[in-house]
Amino acid sequence: MKIKHLEDLNTLVSLSKRRGFVFQSSEIYGGLGSCWDYGPLGSLMKLNVKRAWWNAMTRRPDIVGLDAAILMHPMVWKASGHVDGFSDPLVDCKECKTRFRADNTDSYINEKKCPNCGSKNLSEERSFNLMFKTHMGPLEDSGSVVYLRPETAQGHFVNFQNCQQASRYKIPFGIAAIGKSFRNEITPGNFIFRTREFEQMEMQYFVEPGTDEQFFKEWKERRWNFYIKFGIKPENLKFKDHDKLAHYAKAAVDVEFKFPMGFSELEGIHNRSDFDLSQHMKFSGKNLEYFDEPNKKKYIPYVIETAVGCDRLFLAFLCDAYREEVTTDEAGKEDVRVVMGLHPEIAPFKVAVLPLSKKEELSSISEKLRDQLAEDFDVNYDESQSIGKRYRRQDEIGTPFCVTVDFDTINDQAVTVRHRDKMTQERVAITQLNAYIAAKLKTFNQ
């Protein structure tokens, strides 16, 4: 058997639409550039991705959760530097009207040429702010300007004192959040890799100055282990240190994943020093120092940040999990089984119920079994086409187990359970099925 892994992102885009992972937003109107909707399977899987990250963070004894507002006081973004500095250099081609970023387009950097048509008839570089601006209230004037947040992190900083005092946590401790952010990207693309509306999963870990470098190392290791735990292959991951640091950073490293278009950033891990809290102290006039009671001293905490895009991680899980198993029979005919080898905690459905026939005696048992399993798991029910085609459908969407109800079930009250990856089958009593599936999910890859 030959194994082929994903080489072309278009293969995944097609599968995502066909199976209900991701749809083009507003498709009946021709779509809206780089905006995507998560379908029946995608919404389930995305929830699982967020739950995996959330549990990894907030089930620790030193991290609390936060759900901050998307709209914030505009001075937040002045203090953070976004109003004055959150921009990309933009260039227009006067021939083909293409717009592109000047700082990451090779043909422009090397030869001052348009990446689309090759023309050198280009505009001067100009700064383009990436924040979406809107107005709050009935009047559209300068006093009503607000922004759709470009990151969730600032909610952590302005709520640092609230969270610390309400939870009574002592430093070191963290604040975790999942939420929508918006950036008016010049060149979005590569499916859901870079979009203008996206969901972030960020954690800010507040530490005493002088301990920051050690915690930075620890969080690098923890985040790497998170990806390995949920099934991403080590050879598809690497760390990349930043050559040039952002204005707020003392140190920065990216976790990169090998997407079909090459290694690209999956998560950023940053030592933000005391920049953010210091800035908000300066602009708000509020004292955000932390008082260390045992040592009787005050300081502005340093911050270790971990920031990953949920949509980008969703894409990485699909890219990493996709495989084609190619077998050849004696006549030389090839057969291809497409498998989405997702970790069970990430897969949209944990189990599928497949009655061998649509006859009433099997359907009634199967529907009761579906309801029994649904008390503990996300369950798919499928009774159309041959059992072989139904197995293939479940393989393609990543369902770890298929439960087949056959005519023997009527007498022995047992079902056949099929393992997605091993394709082994086992007969299990209906009364033991929930416990069996739960146990097997925990040891699925062993």
From Swiss-Prot:
Name of the protein in question: Glycine--tRNA ligase
Domain of life of the organism encoding this protein: Bacteria
Family: Belongs to the class-II aminoacyl-tRNA synthetase family.
Location of the protein in the cell: Cytoplasm
Cellular component, GO annotation: cytoplasm
Catalytic activity: tRNA(Gly) + glycine + ATP = glycyl-tRNA(Gly) + AMP + diphosphate
GO molecular function: ATP binding; glycine-tRNA ligase activity; protein dimerization activity
InterPro entries hit by this protein: aa-tRNA-synt_IIb, aa-tRNA-synth_II, aa-tRNA-synth_II/BPL/LPL, Anticodon-bd, Anticodon-bd_dom_sf, Gly-tRNA_synthase/POLG2, Gly_tRNA_ligase_bac, GlyRS-like_core
Gene Ontology biological process: glycyl-tRNA aminoacylation
Job of this protein: Catalyzes the attachment of glycine to tRNA(Gly).
Keyword check for rRNA-binding: no
Positions annotated to bind substrate: R101, E151, F198, E199, Q200, M201, E202, E305, T306, A307, V308, G309
Pfam family, one: tRNA-synt_2b
Known partners and oligomeric status: Homodimer.
Keyword line: Aminoacyl-tRNA synthetase, ATP-binding, Cytoplasm, Ligase, Nucleotide-binding, Protein biosynthesis
Binding locations of ATP: 183-185, 193-198, 265-266, 309-312
EC nos: 6.1.1.14
